Amino acid sequence: MFPWNGSRLGVALLALGLELSVIPATVLAVDLDAGTQRDIRAATFEVVQLKPPDGAVTYERPLPLDLIPYQQRVDLYRSIGTAFAIGPNKYVTAAHVLAAGAASQYGPPALRDAAGNVYPIYQVLQYSQHEDFAVLSLQNPPHHVQVLKAGPKPALNDVVFAVGNALGEGVVIRDGVFTSESPEEFEGKWNFLRFTAAASPGNSGGPLVNRRGQLLGVVLRKSPSENLNYALAIDQVMTARPGEGRISARASVRLPIMDIAETREYDEHFALPLELSEFYKTWLAVIEKENERDYTELLAHNESHVFPHGAGAEKLLHTIESSPLPQRMHEAQNHIWVVDGAKSQNVQLEHNGFVDFTSDMVRLHAPDDVDLATLYGDSKLQMDLFLKAYTLRRMVGTDSVRVTSLGKAKTEETFTDVYGRNWQIKAWAIPNDDAMLIVLSLPTPEGYCGSYFRIPTGFSHMATQQQKRLLDFVFVTMQGSLGRWQSYLTLKGIQPKIFDALSIDVEGHQQVNFRSARFDVSVTPNLLKLSDGSIMRLNFAFLHGADTVVWDVAGIWVAEGPHSQNSVVVWREAEPTSDLPDGFQDRWRKMRNRDFPFNATVASENSETRIATTTLPPGGPSGVKVVYGLRVVAEGTQPQDAMKQKLDLLQRSVKQLEH
C-alpha cells in the first residue's frame, strides 16, 4: 500500500522477498548415491529467524492455528532461505536472504542444521547485492562441518541438482538439467546459470551441484517468464574481492505526484568483515543515502515545474475547495497541477464518529465521547479507531482473521512541512508480517486527517522519509463543531504555524470572530443560529505571498449544524493569470462587476435559497487584485427581502484587509 512508484525503494524491497516461486516437481535425486546425498545435506543449512510474539496485537476471534501445517505451527523459527559451507567457518547464502533480517521484528538470521541446532551469524565477510551472494561466519560454528568443493563448469544438458530447505521440513534435493547461460542485466559482465531443477520458497541461497556433489553455483531465483531457475556461478563467489561489501543497482526513480522519471545507478562499496548488527546498519545507511540523493536530485532537476513553481501551478493557486479528507496534489497533463481526490469509503463509528478513507488518505471524525487531547496523546486509541474502518487481516492457513488492535505505536515523532503544518508520525508494528503500519496525521478540530501506508519493517524509515517529502503536496481544509474548535484552540503545539497569525474567538452559541492579515469576519446569532454543534470550516489554500507561496485561510464557512443547509460563507478570489481557463476569467469578471449570481439577488435550487455579493462596489477601483465573495444560504424557498437583510448583515460583518 505504498502510494508511490517503486523505483529505488522497489529495488531495495526486492531484497526482502524470497524470490523463488513454487514449481511442482517430484523430489528425485536419482543420480546421487547415498554418500553424496549425505555429504550435501551435512554441508547445507536452513537460514532461520526466531518468530516474534504478537505482543499487543488482538484479533476479532481466536486464531485457527490448527489450519497451519504442523511443522510450521510448532517451529519456533521461520525459514527464509538456505546456506551452505564452503570452508572452515565460511558459509554462503543469497544476499536477498541475508537482507531479510535488516531491522526485522523477527530475530536476526541464523543457520540451523538437520539436527535442529541453531548457530547465530557472527560476521558478514563478503556481500554483493547485484550478484546476490553473501559470505558469513558463525559465532559458534559446528565442529567438523562438511564443506562443498567447487566443480567444473557444467556442459549443456548436464544433470544438476538444486538443494535447499523445504520451509522447515528439512533439506530437499531436486534434479534437472543445465539448459543455458544468461548475461547479467546491467552490462553482461557475467553469466547466470539456468537450469530446470525445481526450486521452492526457501531454496534461495542453496547450492547447485553436479552428480558428484561438486558445487556449481548459488540458487537465486525463478525466471519470471518460464519454468527455469537461476543460479550464480560459484566462480563469481570464489573470485570476488575479499573484505568488500558492494551495493549496486540501476533503477527508475519516480514520484507518484509527477510524470517524471530518471534512471539512476549507484555502486557503493564498504569494508568487511562487520558483525551482523553493524552490517545491517551500514547496509541500510547506504541504501537510504542513495534514496535521499536520488529523490533530491529528481526534484531539483524538475524544479521549474514542481509545485508551486511554473505556470502549471496557477490553477491550483487559484483553487479554493472543501477538502476535510486530504487530497494528494499531482501534476496532470501539460504540467498542470490539480487535486483529484480518489473515491473514499466511509465507515460510521459509535457516538457520531466516522472514518473516511482512500487507499492512502484518512479522515477521522472523533466520536463524541473521545476528547481531542486524549486522541492526540493515545496512539492505541488512534489506531483502534482506524482499524474499525481499515481492514487489516492476518492470514492463518486458508483462513484470515481481522486485527482489532495493534496496541501502542512503536515509534512517534513530529514533522513540520514546508508550510508549517505539524504532522504526528506514528508507526505500529505488525509482528507476524514483519511490517509496520504508519500514519502521518495532522490534528484537526474534528480529530485528525493524513496519509497512511504499510511497509516491511526494514524499510519503514526510508519509506517514512519519502512520505514526509510528499506532505508538502497535501491539500486539506480544517473543520469541526464550535465545541471542538474551542478544545482544539487550547491545545498548543499541534496547530499549524499559520495559527500564530490568526485570531479565532469561538463563544459557543454567542458568536464566532475570525481575524487574519487578509480579512475579518464575525458571525452572530442575528446572522446564523449558533450552538456548540454548529460547524465551522476554514478553507485553507495555497496562495501567492509577498515573495513565496503560503498556506493560508482563503475562506470560512459556518453552518447551523452538521446537517443544516443554513450557512454563511466568505471566500477569497484573486485575479487570475491570463493563461488560466475561461471559467476563472468569467468568475473574476462577474465578481468584480457584481454580475449574477453576485448581484444580491436570490436564486433557489436543491431545496435551498442562495444570495451572494462581493466586498467591492460594481466595477470597483482599478488595480484591485483580490476580492472577497459573500454568500448566505437558507433552507427552502426564502423571500428576497429576508435574504437581502441577512446578506447586508454579513457584508457589515466582513472587512477585507488586502487588495
Regions found by a protein language model. Name each.
Residues 331-395, 515-579:
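Secretory pathway targeting signatures of secreted, lumenal, and periplasmic proteins
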Residues 43, 60-75, 118, 137-147, ...:
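Active-site region of chymotrypsin-like
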Residues 149-171:
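Short glycine/Trp-rich loop-beta-loop segment that forms part of the substrate-binding cleft
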Residues 27-84, 91-94, 254-322:
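N-terminal activation segment of mature serine protease catalytic domains
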Residues 248, 342-347, 445-506, 525-527, ...:
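Surface-exposed amphipathic alpha-helical segments
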Residues 385-449, 567-641, 658-659:
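Signature of long, low-cysteine stretches enriched in small and polar/charged residues
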Residues 31-37, 123-124, 144-145, 166, ...:
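C-terminal cap/linker of serine protease catalytic domains
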Residues 74-141, 155-156, 361-374:
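Catalytic-histidine neighborhood of serine endopeptidases
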